[in-house]
């Protein structure tokens, strides 16, 4: 697969470069030249393959890595992710079943394998997104919904915006995701954009980085260029009505304050006997707010990134 820059229409880059560099020479972010799309028939196949096979398939598409399911099993274990079905149509995806009891261990292990075990110190920006996409596809394949390719919502902590970006791309690739429910401990660029149609460009660089790639995925080069120009001038960015409609069709943002998180965790444990981690609690808070506002009760995949038992 070749990659483009969010800030250029002409230059293209190899997967090897994307694995070792965060940005293009013009300061842009790497984006796929053309996203693959999985048909409903292909989505149904997810439930018939192992977790490792599904992860390998997606990563091979992005990086031509020639990985196998055995490669994934060897570096991550045969069951690095487990799903726990709970009442109220909530499915918790525990992405931390490894020796470090943390998702970042699996992410680093997969990245090292992609880099031919060269023990790179830091996972690059797009590699993180691609690995999350692969994990989301593979995790969906372990759920009951995968057997009939049913839509699910995904609830998550959106602090770094890497995971929402990955979920957005997975949705565009054909993974049956209804809404991406983003919880933040405070208002941020995505919350501002969805609720106000505008956002300050004086925010943290990591938030703006995620937003640049998201805007590009919706409006292409022109929209991204306008956003970058606004950021350079440190002005308020106003999203177009069309783009705002596209965002609201797939994203929901809620503030789940640090004072609310412990009560969410305690209440969930009392009701279901399950101890969720603080990051999952932020995602669950977003799910509560979304369901209270819309009345929606679709099955929801809640992402848990570390053991909190």
Placement of each model-derived feature along the sequence:
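PLP-dependent amino-acid enzyme catalytic core
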Residues: 1-309
């Amino acid at each position: 697969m070749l990659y483009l820059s969010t800030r250029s229409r002409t230059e293209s880059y190899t997967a090897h470069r994307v694995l070792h560099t965060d940005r293009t020479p013009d300061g842009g972010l790497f984006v796929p030249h053309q996203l693959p799309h999985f048909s409903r028939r292909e989505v149904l196949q997810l439930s018939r393959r192992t977790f490792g096979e599904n992860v390998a398939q997606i990563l091979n598409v992005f990086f031509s890595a020639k990985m196998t399911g055995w490669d994934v099993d060897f570096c991550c274990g045969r069951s690095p992710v487990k799903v726990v079905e709970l009442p109220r149509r909530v499915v918790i995806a525990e992405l931390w079943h490894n020796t470090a009891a943390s998702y970042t261990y699996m992410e680093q292990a997969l990245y090292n394998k992609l880099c031919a075990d060269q023990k790179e110190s830091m996972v690059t920006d797009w590699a993180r997104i691609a690995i999350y996409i692969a994990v989301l596809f593979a995790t969906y394949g372990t759920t009951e919904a995968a057997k009939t390719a049913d839509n699910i919502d995904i609830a998550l902590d959106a602090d770094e915006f890497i995971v929402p970006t990955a979920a957005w791309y997975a949705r565009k690739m054909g993974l049956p995701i209804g809404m991406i429910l983003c919880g933040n401990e405070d208002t941020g660029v995505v919350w501002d954009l969805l609720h106000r149609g505008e956002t300050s460009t004086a925010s943290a660089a990591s938030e703006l980085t995620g937003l640049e790639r998201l805007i590009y995925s919706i409006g292409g080069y022109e929209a991204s260029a306008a956003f970058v120009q606004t950021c350079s001038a440190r002005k308020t960015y106003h999203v177009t009505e069309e783009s705002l409609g596209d965002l609201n069709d797939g994203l929901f943002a809620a503030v789940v304050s640090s004072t609310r998180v412990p009560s969410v965790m305690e209440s969930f444990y009392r009701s279901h006997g399950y101890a969720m981690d603080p990051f999952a609690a932020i995602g669950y808070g977003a799910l509560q707010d979304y369901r209270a506002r819309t009345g929606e009760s679709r099955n929801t995949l809640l992402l848990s990134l570390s053991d909190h038992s």
